[in-house]
């Protein structure tokens, strides 16, 4: 009797864990579909990082103090990189 009860509880636990994992995968797949614009935003973020650091490097090569380029739209230039404020 105990073995049967343990087997039933084990199966129930596995079923719950499997269902939870399936729900997480479904949620992740929906986020990936909705998150496609985020990859475009990440590309913009990378461009901002690159743009700011390149402008500072060019100014340093000219033996001038590096004037930090002003990043717009909630971004600021810090350590030669645009960071979100």
UniProtKB/Swiss-Prot annotation:
Highest rank taxon of the organism: Eukaryota
Residues in the signal sequence: 1-22
Claim: Secreted is one of the keywords in the record: yes
SS bond partners: 52-66, 56-77, 71-82
PROSITE patterns listed in its UniProt record: HWTX_2 (PS60022)
Propeptide: 23-48
Keyword Signal carried by entry: yes
Primary location group: secreted
GO molecular function, one term: toxin activity
Record localization: Secreted
InterPro entries: Hwtx-2-like
SUPFAM superfamilies, sorted: omega toxin-like
Tissues in which the protein is found: Expressed by the venom gland.
Assigned protein family: Belongs to the neurotoxin 12 (Hwtx-2) family. 02 (Hwtx-2) subfamily.
Subunit structure: Monomer.
Function of the protein: Neurotoxin active on both insects and mammals.
Protein name: U4-theraphotoxin-Hhn1a
Classification of source organism: Eukaryota, Metazoa, Ecdysozoa, Arthropoda, Chelicerata
């Amino acid at each position: 009797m105990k073995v049967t009860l343990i087997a039933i509880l084990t199966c129930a636990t596995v079923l719950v864990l499997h269902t939870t994992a399936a729900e997480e995968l479904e949620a992740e797949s929906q986020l990936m579909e909705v998150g496609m614009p985020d990859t475009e935003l990440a590309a913009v973020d990378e461009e901002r990082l690159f743009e700011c650091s390149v402008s500072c490097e060019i100014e340093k090569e000219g033996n001038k103090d590096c004037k930090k380029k002003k990043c717009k739209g909630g971004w600021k230039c810090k350590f030669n990189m645009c960071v979100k404020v």
